[in-house]
């Protein structure tokens, strides 16, 4: 009788041990899965955070803007827009070749991409902007000859938009009093916005006269 009791106790002990080992293995596997998941989530969060930082910091600032007057008969418009840009504070490098400009006026909405029209002296030639889907740029200051990439705070470039071609046929540019909104977006998604209002009066201005915007 007592021998049977001892055998039963031994079987129960072995069974309990097997169950315990199985529980330990399951817990270890679960812990490994949790660690891997946590690592993946952390890496994903870091990537998303870096992308958000890039969108905020990797962009240009518009230092100033001016236009050129187009005089056709008695009509005067602004047919070219010039923007002096530099890197925003804390920004990484920005390639103008990979930059887009969203152009929005009272009559036109377009997304402009970069068109290399510079001459041998890195001066932009707006006359070569023959389609309404492009902007161009020239170098103003570039200490390491990296243009069309802005990679130092001292770098300056001049972005040029030919509003006559952007606004389309039968126009000579943007009319007096008209507002143009420009969203300049780098490859990383960082955006600088500038809103320009054309002067109310251009009387007395001749063809190609500069005008502050």
Curated annotation (Swiss-Prot):
Major subcellular location class: other
Effect of residue 70 to Q: Defects in flagella motility. Decreased glycosylation
Alphabetical list of Pfam families matching this protein: Arch_flagellin
InterPro entries per UniProt: Flagellin/pilin_N_arc, Flagellin_arc
A GO CC term assigned to this protein in UniProt: archaeal-type flagellum
Disruption phenotype: Cells are non-motile. Cells lacking both flgA1 and flgA2 show defects in motility, whitout affecting surface adhesion ability.
Impact reported for residue 172 to Q: Defects in flagella motility. Decreased glycosylation
Residues modified by glycosylation: 70, 115, 172
Compartment(s): Archaeal flagellum
Key words, A-Z: Archaeal flagellum, Glycoprotein
GO molecular function, one term: structural molecule activity
The keyword Glycoprotein appears for this protein: yes
Propeptide: 1-10
Keyword Glycoprotein belongs to the record: yes
GO process terms (BP): archaeal or bacterial-type flagellum-dependent cell motility
PTM comment text: Glycosylated by a pentasaccharide similar to the S-layer glycoprotein, probably comprising a hexose, 2 hexuronic acids, a methyl ester of a hexuronic acid and mannose. Glycosylation is required for biosynthesis of stable flagella.
Family: Belongs to the archaeal flagellin family.
Biological function: Major flagellin required for motility. Not involved in PibD-dependent surface adhesion. Much more abundant in cells compared to FlgA2.
Protein name per Swiss-Prot or TrEMBL: Flagellin A1
Species of origin: Haloferax volcanii (strain ATCC 29605 / DSM 3757 / JCM 8879 / NBRC 14742 / NCIMB 2012 / VKM B-1768 / DS2) (Halobacterium volcanii)
């Amino acid at each position: 009788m007592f021998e049977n009791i001892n055998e039963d106790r031994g079987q129960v002990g072995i069974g309990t041990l097997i169950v315990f080992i199985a529980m330990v293995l399951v817990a270890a596997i679960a812990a490994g899965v949790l660690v891997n998941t946590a690592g993946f989530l952390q890496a994903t969060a870091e990537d998303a955070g870096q992308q958000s930082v890039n969108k905020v910091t990797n962009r240009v600032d518009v230092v100033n803007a001016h236009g050129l007057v187009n005089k056709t008969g008695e009509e005067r418009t602004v047919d070219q827009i010039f923007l002096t840009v530099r890197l925003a504070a804390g920004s990484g490098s920005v390639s103008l070749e990979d930059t887009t400009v969203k152009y929005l006026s009272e009559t036109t909405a377009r997304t402009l991409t970069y068109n290399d029209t510079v001459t041998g002296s890195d001066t932009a030639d707006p006359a070569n902007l023959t389609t309404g889907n492009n902007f161009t740029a020239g170098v103003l200051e570039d200490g390491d000859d990296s243009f069309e990439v802005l990679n130092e705070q001292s770098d300056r470039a001049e972005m040029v938009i030919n509003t006559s071609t952007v606004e389309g046929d039968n126009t000579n540019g943007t009319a007096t009093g008209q507002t143009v909104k420009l969203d300049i977006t780098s490859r990383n998604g960082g955006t600088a916005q500038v809103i320009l209002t054309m002067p109310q009066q251009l009387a007395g201005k001749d063809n190609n006269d500069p005008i502050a915007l």
